[in-house]
Amino acid sequence: MLRIYLKIWNFEIRVYNMDGSSPAEFSELLTLSTDSVGAIEENQDEITVHYGNGIIKFPSKVSFNSVTWNLNCYCEPNVLQALRDWRRLVYDTETERMGLPTEYMRNVYFIKYDGQGNVRDVIKCPGTWIGALNNGEMNQQGGDIVKVTVPLVI
């Protein structure tokens, strides 16, 4: 039997609008800028129901942990601006306006490929938004690319 392994480096993230019909306006830019993604955990709690003298357990809805998304920061196209625009949909610090979930939530797909480029695994995380924006370190010592970190709240 031939075994084909999933490699940790063969993946992409796709960000879609909540209706799922079209990629978000910044989707391709952020996909191409991706450096790494933290582990995605699928959790399912139990619901305990008292029934007569006994207890019955049922599975709950699947939930996901928040995931750390690391991106390479490019000046053109502007990765930081695209992330800030998405974050401003959650809360705009200039107008002090809190956004509506339909405005800032996105469907995020984590897609893994095999060595031939065939899709082997897709994790869909509906209702995802940016929890914060770490703008990356700065120093005068080298020519390293700035790494931007974004926790995705799923």
What are these regions (language model features)?
Residues 1-154:
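Glycine-rich, low-complexity intrinsically disordered segments
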